[in-house]
Design a protein with these regions (language model features):
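Anion-binding (especially nucleotide phosphate/pyrophosphate-binding) glycine-rich loop
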Residues: 2-29, 57-162
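Short amphipathic
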Residues: 28-32, 83, 211-215
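Structural beta-strand/beta-sheet cores of well-ordered domains, especially the beta-sheet scaffolds
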Residues: 34, 59, 69, 116-118, ...
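N-terminal cofactor/phosphate-binding cores enriched in small/glycine residues
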Residues: 42, 54-55
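ATP-dependent small-molecule kinase catalytic core of the GHMP/sugar-kinase superfamily
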Residues: 46, 152-215
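Short, solvent-exposed loop/turn segments at secondary-structure junctions
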Residues: 46-47, 129
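Short Gly/aromatic-enriched secondary-structure transition segments
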Residues: 47-54
């Protein structure tokens, strides 16, 4: 989500400090938001129109390159660390939170990108299982971080499609494109009118007095 939020900026700074203590390196930090959907529930996977909006809850990823072909991934939310070899991807996910990370890395690799070894520290405040797209937020933040640290060009629509593919084919969740698309394209103070068939989209200003209430 584009725009500035002092609280989110402070959380990102704290994550960077934790990363430096854990990995003894200065990271780059990326974040991607969760979402609410205002119009068009259950129409994204039927190629219909939807109108989601990004929210302030987000997933943050601190990342720095390694000198080998490993991804070392630590989750602050789960207080757990996992390691993966970029040259030996598993066939499918195992039902673990890290499936979303390795699934994105694998999908990027099989789409012509070349992820490099990296250390990642992940935390987020998108409520899990609440319909706010915590998984898409994680996928997009990780995908953007992996592409950036590898020095690769980033096309936001392609990133959204690859993250959707990772969730469909590696994680095994049959989602449409809406969640990953708004997480990668969301703008502060705007909803997004999206045609899920053509992927044409238009940001719609919400207005200064508009409030989105999540309950």
């Amino acid at each position: 989500m584009r725009g500035s939020n002092p609280e989110i900026d402070n959380q990102a700074e704290c994550l960077g400090q934790k990363f430096a203590q854990l990995f003894d390196a200065a990271p780059r930090i990326f974040q991607a938001p969760g979402r609410v959907n205002l119009i068009g529930e259950h129409t994204d996977y039927n190629d219909g129109f939807v109108m989601p909006a990004a929210i302030d809850f987000c997933t943050r990823v601190a990342i720095a390159p390694r000198h080998d072909r490993k991804l070392v991934v630590r989750s602050e939310n789960f207080a757990e660390q996992r390691e993966f070899n970029l040259d030996a991807f598993p066939d499918k996910g195992s039902g673990h939170w890290s499936d979303y990370v390795i699934g994105v890395a694998k999908t990027l690799s099989f789409s012509g990108s070349t992820p490099i070894g990296a250390n990642l520290l992940i935390e987020g405040d998108v409520p899990q299982g609440a319909g706010l797209s915590s998984s898409a937020s994680l996928e997009v933040a990780v995908g953007y971080a992996l592409l950036d640290v590898a020095g690769e060009a980033i096309d936001l629509t392609k990133l959204a499609l690859l993250c959707q593919k990772a969730e469909n084919e590696f994680v095994g969740a049959r989602c449409g494109i809406m969640d990953q698309f708004i997480s990668s394209h969301g703008q502060n103070g705007h909803a997004l009118l999206l045609d899920c068939r053509s992927l044409e989209y238009r940001p719609l200003p919400l207005g200064d007095e508009a409030r989105l209430v999540i309950c």
